[in-house]
Amino acid sequence: MDARSKWKATALLTWLLTTEIAHGLPHVGNKVEATLQRTATESASAFETQYPPSSSENRLLIPESHPVYRVGLQQDGHSSEQPFPQFDILQFVDGLEDLLDSDGDTATPAPTAPTQSTESTETDRSDHIQATSSAKHPENTVLIPTAASGTVSPQANPSTTKGQVDPVKTGPPPVASDKPKAMNGQDIFQPVATGPVPANIKSRDDHPVKNEHINGTDPIATNKFYAGLFLGSQTNATYTQPYSLAWSKGGGSLKSWGMIVSHVQSHMLAYGPPDNKIPGNPVKYYINPVALEHLILSATELGQSSIMSVEQPKAFSANAVIKSSAGSAQQITFPVVQGMGYVTAVYNDMEPLIESGIFFRKVVSAGSPRPGIFKYQVFLDDDTTWLLYATPAGGEDPKFKLVSKTHLGGPKGFSGTIQVAKNPAGKSGEKFYDNSSGVYPVAGEISGSLTGDVGTYTLSWTKSGKDIKGTPLIMFALPHHVHSFDSATEGRITDIHLRTTTKGNSTAVIGESWTLVEKNLPIDIGFAPWSTTDGSVHELSAAAQHAIIQAAPHELKQNISEQTDLNSMYYSGKALSKFATLVYTVNQLGNNVELATDAFQTLKKSFNLFVQNKQQFPLAYDSTWKGVVSTAGYNGDLNQDFGNTAYNDHHFHYGYFIQAAAIIGSLDPSWLAANKEWVNMLVRDSGNSVANDPHFPFSRSFDWYNGHSWAKGLFESFDGKDQESTSEDTMFAYAIKMWGKTIGDASMEARGNVMLGILGRSLHNYFLMEDDNANQPANFIANKVTGILFENKVDHTTYFGANLEYIQGIHMLPLMPHSPFTRRKEFVRQEWQAMFAESASTPASKVEGGWKGVLYANLALIDPKAAWEFFAQPNFDYSWIDGGATRTWYLAFVAGESFGWSIMSLRELINILGLGGSP
C-alpha cells in the first residue's frame, strides 16, 4: 500500500472512531469506539484457535476444489449472421456517377495512418468548418485540410468567444428537437408512460422459457446479474462483484447443497494463446475459474429434497432462498446485492454448516466486535484470510467447531445471520469489517438529475440486520465509480481492495449511499454531425453539400419497403434507422427537402407497418416475464432474430426504431400523435425509468451499477451475462436522448445524456483499452477492444466470426453523432495504428464488404481528410457500405468531423492530389 493510501485509511479509521455525526453515515458513537479499542487490547487468551483434526491421512490430502475453466463460447441465443442486413446495393446504382465529376477513372491515394499530430485538433478550437452562402447550386468544390484559417464553425449555440463571427445561414434551420434545452435539476427517472401496451400487441402466457423458480408477479429484469439463480439448472454463478455465488445443488467436490462463495485472484486466471497478428501479441482471451469452493454457507438439513427459489428480484438485488424441502419453514435466505461487502446468509431454525473445498488451515474465535456478534478468522490453504461474523437472533455464543479440514459446524436450531468476507488488508481491513458487521444491504435504488451539462446520480441501499441505525454499510465500488465520486463519497473510501472478475479492482466504501458526478455531458449532440471541439455542425460547406446531393439519389432509389420489412426486428430497425438518417441528411444537411420527400413518405409508411404490428413476425406482450418480444422465437427456435424472444439484445433492436422515430418526429411533428405510444412502449421494455411500472421492469438492459448494458437475456450461461457491441449500447442511450428531445420528455432526454456520460467512462475503463488501461490484464490490453465481455471472462472474438474487422468493428457501428464522445480520439488512434494502418496486419484498404465503410467512417474521428478521400473517391464501390448505413450519411459525418477545412476548387484539388487534368 502506498503512503497516501495508508494515510487515507488511517484518517478514515480515526474519523470512524471520533466523529459524532458523519456526513453520509449513521451515528456510530462511542459503542464502536469502545468495541474497536476492546478488540485491540483483548488478551490473547480471549481468542481460541482451532485446527483440523490431525492424522497421517489428512496430511496427504490436497484441496478438493479444483479450478474449472470453461473456455467454450456458448452460442445459445446468438446468430452467426453478420450484424447488418445483406442487400445487393449495386442494383440501385446507375453508372456509379463520380461525386467529384472528374473525367476518367482516377484512383484516390490510400489514406495514410493518422499520426499524433491529429490530436492537436482536440484542443485547438480555432480550426473550424467553412460556412458558405452557396447552398442551392454549389460549384465543383471539395473540402481539403489546411492550417488554421480563422473561419467560423456553425454552432448549435452561439459561442461566447470574442472575435467570432456568426456563420452565414443556409437552407432550412435545424429541426427544433436538435437544439439543446437548458435543464436545472431535471429528474432523470420520471415515468415514460403508465398505461398498458397498445391493444394490437396481443398478450401471450406461453413463453418458451418458463418461470419456475421466481416467487412473485412483478415484472422481471431478465438481463440482470442474478439470472443464474433461476435459469436452467440454477447452478451457474451470480457475480455480485467482487464475490461470486453459486448453488452447489449436491455437486462439486463436497456434494454440498449450500451456497458457494468464491473470489478469484489474478494468479488463477487462464489465458488463451497469443495473437501474433497484433502488435504486442496479446492473449486472445482470459477466463476466471469456476467451481472454486472457498466457502459454502450450508446447513445439515439441506439435501436431495432441497429447493431454491428467488424472491423480490429488482434492479440491484434479489433474494435467493434455499429450503430444506418444499413448504418447509427451515430455510436460508441470501440477500444478493451488487457490490455487497459481505455475503450474508439469514438462517431460520437450521444447523449451520460452513464448508470449504480449499480446506480450512485454522479457524480463530476472535471475540465480539459488538455485543451479540461473534467473530471468527478463517485461514484457508490457499493462503487467503476470510472473516466470519455470526449474529444469533437470541444473542448466545454459537460456538462454531472445526470438525475437519472441510467442515465448520454450528449449533442446532440456529436463527440469525452468518456473514463472510475476504480480507486482503490485514488489521486495518479487519477493523472496517468489524465496524460494519451485523448489517447488510437488501435492496438498492438509484436517483439522478441533470443541471446544465453536469449529471449527478446516487446509488443507495436499504439495509437490515442488528443495530441498523448505528452501523454503517460497507459496499464495493468499481473503478468507474471511484473515478466519479463526489468529495463526500471519496472521503469514505477504505484501503480494502478486491479484484473483480472482469473489471479490475473493487474498492470498499463506507456508507449507505454514493453520489457520483458526470461532467461535460454532450447535451448539445443532436442529429447533425458532432465533434468534441465544435459541437453540433448543422451547416456543412457547399462542397460537402454538393457531395451529399450527388450521392443521395442513388441511395434514395433503394426499396425502402422491402429493406425494412424483414423477418428480424434487429435488421428491420437498422434499415429504418438508415433511411431516417438518410432523409435527415438530405433534408437538413444537404438543404434539399424536395429530394427526400418521396423517400420520407415511404419511410413513414414502412414504420407504420410495425406500429400496426403487421410485420413478418409481429410483437407480442409476454405476460410471463413481462415485456414485448418478437414472436419469431415461439416456433421452437429461440435463436431466431438473435434471441429477441428470450430478451436478447432488446436495447440494440429497439434502439434503432427509437432513433428512427426521433428523426421522423422531428421532421414531421404531426406524426407523433399516432406513433408516440408505440415508440414509448419500446423504451419502457428495453430501458424503463421507474421500478413501479406493472407492465415492464426497471432498466432491463442498462446496468446502473456496472455502467453499461448486458445483452444476454433468458439463456443459461456459466460465464454470466455478456455484451458484444459497446457502440450499439451507446446508440440506445443516444436514441432515448433524441426521442426524449423530440417528444418533449425532458426526463428521458436527460437520462440519455447521463447514460452517455456513464458509458463514456465505463467503456474507457473496461472495453475500449488504451495502452495505459489499468483494469484489464496487461497481456490482453493490446487487443484494444475486449471483444465479448462476460461477467466471468473476456474473449477477443465475436459470435459471428473472428476476423479482426468484425471484432473491432462491432464496437464501432453504427457511426452516429455521439460516436466521437464515446470513442475517444487517443483510443481510436491507437487502435487504427495497431490494426488497420497500411503497415498493420489487417489494412483497412484491403478489408472487403461493408466492414470497409465502417472502418473508414470510424477513421473520421481522428483523420477526416483520409476518410473524406475514401468516401468521395471516384467510382466508389457501394459494396463497401453495409446494409445498415449509407454513403450519404458517411459523407456528412466525415465533413462534420472536418473542422479547420477550407474550400478549394475541384480543379485545384485534382492538381494537388496528382489526379491529372489541365490547370
Specify the residue positions occupied by each region the protein language model found.
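Extended, hydrophobic alpha-helical segments in both membrane/secreted and soluble proteins
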Residues: 682-686
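Short sequence/structural elements of tandem HEAT/ARM alpha-solenoid repeats
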Residues: 597-601, 673-681, 750
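Substrate-binding surface in catalytic domains of secreted glycosidases
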Residues: 722
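"A position-specific structural signal for the A-helix of alpha-solenoid helical repeats
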Residues: 735-738
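Aromatic-rich carbohydrate-recognition surfaces in CAZymes
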Residues: 566-587, 644-671, 675-679, 725-733
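Ser/Thr/Asn(+Pro)-rich, low-complexity disordered segments
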Residues: 2, 6, 15, 20-651, ...
